[in-house]
């Protein structure tokens, strides 16, 4: 016999979803079905929560308590960098392995680093900023018109001052 249902118990599920799209409820069913939730309704909640990250893969945190699911986006560094580029939405089915060729100001990188600081193991904002610059390089964009790695070298050399917080 299964254990008694505790209404105060909180469970967390982490899923990868494409922003603004209702995922296949057949993919959600094995994860959500045993918790007594409707996969279709949860899929719509996820689509609502991720609509500002339209077309970008993001991690979604589902907080499940008393058979109620609340979806919240846990943005990754790459999704924040891609949204900072403000590029038009591309058709995911037609274009694969897209290289982003935009340009981000350095101040925007520092803002993303502040958002990601709680998740990073970096000791200060400079080290977290270097992590974000590395992500920007792998995404394929430029920072202030330069290669992100050149800016990392400039931070290491002390040529660029990084704010404390």
From Swiss-Prot:
Q: Which SUPFAM superfamilies does its entry note?
A: Ribosomal L11/L12e N-terminal domain (SSF54747), Ribosomal protein L11, C-terminal domain (SSF46906)
Q: Where, by residue number, does the polypeptide cross the bilayer?
A: none
| Localization | Cytoplasm
KW Nucleus (keyword) present: no
- A Pfam family (short name) is Ribosomal_L11
GO CC annotation terms, alphabetical:
cytosolic large ribosomal subunit
Q: Which family does it belong to?
A: Belongs to the universal ribosomal protein uL11 family.
**So what does this one do?**
Component of the ribosome, a large ribonucleoprotein complex responsible for the synthesis of proteins in the cell. The small ribosomal subunit (SSU) binds messenger RNAs (mRNAs) and translates the encoded message by selecting cognate aminoacyl-transfer RNA (tRNA) molecules. The large subunit (LSU) contains the ribosomal catalytic site termed the peptidyl transferase center (PTC), which catalyzes the formation of peptide bonds, thereby polymerizing the amino acids delivered by tRNAs into a polypeptide chain.
Task: Report the protein name in the record.
Answer: Large ribosomal subunit protein uL11
Species name: Candida albicans (strain SC5314 / ATCC MYA-2876)
Q: Which gene encodes it?
A: RPL12
């Amino acid at each position: 016999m299964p254990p008694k249902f505790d209404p105060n118990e909180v469970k967390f599920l982490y899923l990868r979803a494409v922003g603004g799209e209702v995922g296949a409820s057949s993919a959600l069913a094995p994860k959500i079905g045993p918790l007594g939730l409707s996969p279709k309704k949860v899929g719509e909640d996820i689509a609502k929560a991720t609509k500002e990250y339209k077309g970008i893969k993001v991690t979604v945190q589902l907080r499940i308590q008393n058979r109620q699911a609340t979806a919240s986006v846990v943005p990754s560094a790459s999704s924040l960098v891609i949204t900072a580029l403000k590029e038009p939405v591309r058709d995911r089915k037609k274009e694969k392995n897209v290289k982003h060729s935009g340009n981000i100001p350095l101040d925007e990188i520092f803002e993303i680093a502040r958002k990601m600081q709680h998740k990073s193991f970096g000791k200060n904002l400079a080290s977290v900023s270097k992590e974000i610059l590395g992500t920007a390089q792998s995404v394929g964009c430029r920072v202030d018109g330069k290669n992100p790695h050149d800016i990392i070298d400039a931070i290491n050399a002390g040529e660029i001052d990084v704010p404390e917080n």
